[in-house]
Amino acid sequence: MYSNFGQFINGQWQQAEKKETYKVINPATEEVLGEASKASSVDVQKALKSAEKGLETWKNTTPWQRSYVIRKIADLMRERKDVLAKWLTLEVGKPLKEAIGEVGGGADIFEWNAEETKRIYGETLQSRFPETRVHVYYQPVGVVAALVPWNFPIVLASRKISTALAAGCSVICKPDVITPGAVMELVNICKDAGVPDGVVNLLSGDPAEISNELLDSDIIKKVSITGSTRVGKLILKKAADKVQRVTMELSGHSPFIVFDDVDMNKVADMAITAKFRNNGQVCISPNRFYIQETRKEEFVNAFVDRAKKLKIGNGMDEGTDLGPLTTAKRLEE
């Protein structure tokens, strides 16, 4: 399944320099989906040089042309939603209907940023000197390292890649080793949509090794990460040494609050969706429920009744509401 991909560098799919691979597991069957390419230090350096060169091309591309390409990515995602969704279900384990919804959300993000490309406004400020005008012009920050998690690889890769492209930046995307194929398919769509060589790159392999080498480089000017607080702290410390800008979305500890004036049927439906989407492997999945005493019993009964009706199974099977946990580690926890 992964033989058509590999590392995406300078507009081309290529196998890793050392020809190393790692196994990707289907969580529903525990079977090996295939072996994905594992990047070495040589591959990371190639990607950095590629992105540095791609930046010069993309930042000098007009906002209108960038917008056209980004919108084309959204269009192709919708055309190929079944392919992308299948990758998500096979690698993450989520039900196919959830996977299709995630692809739609990712396409919407690209469409939104296609319009934002043309809305990067500067400013004119009043000067203290009578014959002076002060103008503010916004320029691309540079090459972006996008570190993508496994639980929502399409929507979160879309968020990171599309915003970088809208701002005129090139990007090196690192998918999680659990879900490389879904992001590879998305990057291939970027290629087919006309993104110039070197503007979008992908490195697949050991997360710590790739991330550390990217952040050690003077070429990387910004890091975007969605992940755990523990990893976020490590990234923040490394980024500080290079004064790299950082955008972080870390962990979650979400309460679900129910007041006494609610429509209980709607609230119970929302609670089930929030708690069990992607089998609860979501940073905003509720782990605490605060219910006003007057409605507590009613809520508990409604929630339990709906939970009993959820169908557990392989995400590829029609009618499945709850797929497997994605990794053995999560099952053991």
PLM region spans:
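Rossmann-like NAD(P) dinucleotide-binding subdomain of oxidoreductase/dehydrogenase enzymes
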Residues: 122-266
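Terminal low-complexity tails and localization/encapsulation signals of metabolic enzymes
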Residues: 1-35, 68, 72, 122-145
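Hydrophobic face of alpha-helices
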Residues: 48, 67-74, 85, 103, ...
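Short linear capping/connector segments at secondary-structure termini
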Residues: 87-95, 125-131, 251, 317-323
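Residue-level signal for inorganic ion chemistry
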Residues: 30, 66, 88, 110, ...
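ALDH superfamily catalytic-core signature
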Residues: 230-333
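Generic secondary-structure signature for well-ordered alpha-helical cores
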Residues: 53-57, 75-82, 93, 115-119, ...
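Glycine-rich loop-to-alpha-helix module at the N-terminal edge of alpha/beta enzyme cores
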Residues: 31-120, 131
